[in-house]
Amino acid sequence: SGVNVLAPTWYSVTDSSGKMSCYASAGLVNKMHQRGTDVWALVSDFDTNVDFAALYSSKKARTNMVNTLINDAEKYGFDGINLDCENIKSAYAKDYLQFVRELSIACERKGLVLSTDNYKPEAYNRCYNLKEQSRFVDYVIVMAYDEHYAGTDAGSVASLPFVKEAVEDTVQLVGKEHVIAGIPFYTRIWSLTPKDTDNVSQTDTSDSSNYTTSSSVYGM
């Protein structure tokens, strides 16, 4: 009953010309509207075969994406657009920001909400430039999770100190009225496997270097 926005993953960039796969559903939008829930169409950049540097540096490609999203908003009736672009590199980050600017202008003209998903602010992702983003988007969503993930030591997905720091660091760059804290609806079950399986009984259990750490994701 507390959910007021649904953001389904409906679009995924498929090539550097700005083409996107689309799974939008007017039926779902209508059903959510009947419940008083807005729908923001989520756009992802998870296809590693796409040349994102070429995509964002091309005015034509950016325009293709903007036009597709704006036209589809009218076609399917969704209320906003959420950019879940998690693979932005510093080499073309300025071009991505230009895409955000251009999309924001089109969204404002059509009365659409625009939001972006971002990592917890760190030195390595500074190129996302949250302060600049906040000048053009309605909401900056901080992904306050993945504190530990596959390949790291075992630990919490989103401990309270981690989440608190993520929000506080984001608010230093973005007005708090424009910040949404993203929380995980999943956890990880961690497993330790002895590296020396022939002498398990002699393995020093106090030394984690004797084990291989792995994890599985479980959603709620």
What role is predicted for each listed range?
Residues S1, S57-K75, E122-Q133:
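Short, acidic/polar
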Residues S1-T68:
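Glycan-recognition patch characteristic of GH18 chitinases/ENGases
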Residues N4-P8, T37-V43, I81-L83, L114-T116, ...:
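Hydrophobic faces of well-ordered beta-strands that scaffold small-molecule active sites
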Residues W10, V66-D95, Y139-D153:
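Active-site groove signature of glycoside hydrolases
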Residues Y11, T37, S44-F46, E86-I88, ...:
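Solvent-exposed coil/turn segments that connect beta secondary-structure elements
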Residues T14-S17, A53-K59, E86-A93, T152-V157:
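The substrate-binding groove and active-site-proximal loops of carbohydrate-active enzymes
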Residues D15, A93-M220:
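Substrate-binding surface in catalytic domains of secreted glycosidases
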